């Protein structure tokens, strides 16, 4: 048999549940990479992960590397042979070291001259001998920033290791990993089956743990099992609210999921639903239940890791904790309602936003001004925008947000309603944090969008203004995410705003002069770079982006309209020829820039029908295209310009631009310049060629 299954299991103390799936994926990927590097073929890889183990099963792993032919370089030809082409001592010595005769040596030309070399057949090594080093190398590559050491071991790992399985087929791979000798024994559930379980062959691993150890080893299967059990248990009361992040975490906490249903005091339903959900999620990792109308019910789902002989006791324990936590939340909420958002403004002055940029109170006042400025540009109520901007950060100093930071904005929404602030202001306080991540929903109304953009613009200007732009993968102030949020809001909400004007306004709102005098330009370039990355993710060709960028639009919505117009233009049959013609025009004009003294076209200097035809078509199309340009109907404008293909082709076929007659030459250059300007006001089509 030339292949066997290979099994690795690392048994340890409970792994971090939020990182378990990521660790499992990383281990599988690094082992795959190392096997490929060693030129060991295999069919596929399965990964397993539970709180107490990380495992990888490799199916049909080759038992030996393939035989390889390697080249070994020797001395130069000059050193290897004398004038009579007789092998020298150096040549004999090299041949002897390779185990061949001098007649079997070959000559190869390189950049450094001619050298002799020998082809050696290298037999492949046994997989059994290679595996220990392969696994060691894979483990070193695991993303474990908080690895720990235990006992008197020198080895580091995420958690202390208690056992290791290394099996190739039915054979043990003799090795010591992470301070433990490899064996063929795994362990079952910590409480239900703590004894060792003998694994006779790798393919039995998952089944043995399930039937003997009460462990569902496959992370994905366990997660879907938990989902199904939660939904089934909740269906008796209503419908479970399943947070995918919490489901992932709970899957990383249990090996044998058991579902129980508990309840809390109905009086707590008077609290905002987000408070109830967050309390249950953060403190007890439980799932809420709602009715058909979406209202919360006084029940929750517990995912336990044991089949208790007295499940009621487990439920009562969880209920006691949940009720106590909800009582705390109710206390925080009632306390917070005693102080209005506006009266919290002075307390924001005690919270530093950034040492060089002042406090959160300073930031709130800057957002107030910038939100009003944006509101004026898009013709909505400036006073409401200013009010929402001023109060946008006030809930950050509330007791509830201090306890649950993820409720920022949400609590501000409820407190604003309690303070009888306008509904739009309350919504803006909640929604100005949107979008929180890639693909997240956007603010629903324009007032919220104003505050959201103002907040992000202020942050970008401030941080870049003190020369702390993101570098590499370091972005502590999440400026890249802020830039993408601005772009998505402006483009998807169809808000036409001059980005450069916004940045300058934000810069002027800072009470102190920012150290970076070029902050507005650098911030603009930073945001446009995020726009480029966004389009690349949407598979917009880089050439299309560069073509539009060449026209320097400062309005992201306008930029997007041009992108779509150029993409449509590329579908036209005339597109390639026009792009090539524009490139030709661009090259001619670059070389003859000094001769472009006059932009006026003199028809009396034409001496061919081709010149008249192109000039007449340009004049006819220019008026129509310029009107479409003013309406920002770029798609139709470029479609109209496509009709110039024929007169442009005829012009280049019949007319010599660089003639000796200076007047005619300059006149023809002026004609080409007019053609270029007509196209380039939308995008530089020549860059598509």
From Swiss-Prot:
One of its GO terms (cellular component) is cytosol. SUPFAM superfamilies: HD-domain/PDEase-like (SSF109604). GO terms for molecular function: arginine-tRNA ligase activity; ATP binding; glycine-tRNA ligase activity. It is found in: Cytoplasm. The keyword Ligase applies. Its EC number is 6.1.1.14. Keywords: Aminoacyl-tRNA synthetase, ATP-binding, Cytoplasm, Ligase, Nucleotide-binding, Protein biosynthesis. It catalyses: tRNA(Gly) + glycine + ATP = glycyl-tRNA(Gly) + AMP + diphosphate. This is Glycine--tRNA ligase beta subunit. The gene is glyS.
